[in-house]
Amino acid sequence: MHPEAKEPDCGFSEVLPRELGSLFSDTYTEESHYAFCGTELRITQHYGANLGVAAPVWDAALFLCGYFEEQKLDFKGKKVIELGAGTGIVGILVSLLGGHVTLTDLPHALSQIQKNVSANVSSNNPPQVCALSWGLDQEKFPQDYDFVLGADIVYLHDTYPLLIQTLQYLCGPQTSIFLSSKMRQEHGTMHFFQDILPQYFASELVKRNKDEEINIYKVTRYQN
């Protein structure tokens, strides 16, 4: 445990090297509009910017946003971190709902996230945008989050131990984790949720889109 860890200083200029800006030259961008919880989100996706899976708005992210709307979850004043934020749509929505949000991803995705934050969130309560590599630098972050969020971040088997390690560090007894995932058999996603995750956390399937094969799990620490 590292109780001394505080919210990292994630000034955008500090976590994103200048040279990464060149990744976004001559790229194809697409702006999409989404409506959740009475607010409209304008999300730009930078295709062809070497972003890979971080570029698009995935269906699992939209499904999670819809779940928050349906359940009327109260994020006001809550401390929230999103892992593998990609476009940032989930964390941006939570920020607009009053959460104190930190959006994280690998360094190459941060410019896209920051642009979407700037397009949607006023200066009153902007999310922090930070680099976080699972299993490597999670100890730069605090351990008192109310919510940890992830949308379509369970798809590479080699990263599963790193994700578990990161969740174990970030989550305290009071933390609720929401993971929304496309259940891709070829990527072992079901294996993660049925066999790996229960070794470390209690999990509950709270929402399922049968047609799209997307599940939302609420995950918490086991209570002694």
Swiss-Prot record:
It catalyses: L-lysyl-[protein] + 3 S-adenosyl-L-methionine = N(6),N(6),N(6)-trimethyl-L-lysyl-[protein] + 3 S-adenosyl-L-homocysteine + 3 H(+); L-lysyl-[protein] + S-adenosyl-L-methionine = N(6)-methyl-L-lysyl-[protein] + S-adenosyl-L-homocysteine + H(+); N(6)-methyl-L-lysyl-[protein] + S-adenosyl-L-methionine = N(6),N(6)-dimethyl-L-lysyl-[protein] + S-adenosyl-L-homocysteine + H(+); N(6),N(6)-dimethyl-L-lysyl-[protein] + S-adenosyl-L-methionine = N(6),N(6),N(6)-trimethyl-L-lysyl-[protein] + S-adenosyl-L-homocysteine + H(+). The gene is eef1akmt3. InterPro entries: Methyltransf_16, SAM-dependent_MTases_sf. Transmembrane segments: none annotated. It is found in: Cytoplasm; Cytoplasm, Cytoskeleton, Microtubule organizing center, Centrosome. It holds the Pfam family Methyltransf_16. Belongs to the methyltransferase superfamily. METTL21 family. It comes from the Eukaryota. It is an enzyme of class 2 (transferase). It comes from Xenopus tropicalis (Western clawed frog). Keywords: Cytoplasm, Cytoskeleton, Methyltransferase, S-adenosyl-L-methionine, Transferase. Protein-lysine methyltransferase that selectively mono-, di- and trimethylates 'Lys-165' of the translation elongation factors EEF1A1 and EEF1A2 in an aminoacyl-tRNA and GTP-dependent manner. EEF1A1 methylation by EEF1AKMT3 is dynamic as well as inducible by stress conditions, such as ER-stress, and plays a regulatory role on mRNA translation. S-adenosyl-L-methionine binds at residues 58, 84-86, 105, 134, 151. GO terms for biological process: peptidyl-lysine methylation. GO terms for cellular component: centrosome; cytoplasm. This is EEF1A lysine methyltransferase 3. Its EC number is 2.1.1.-.
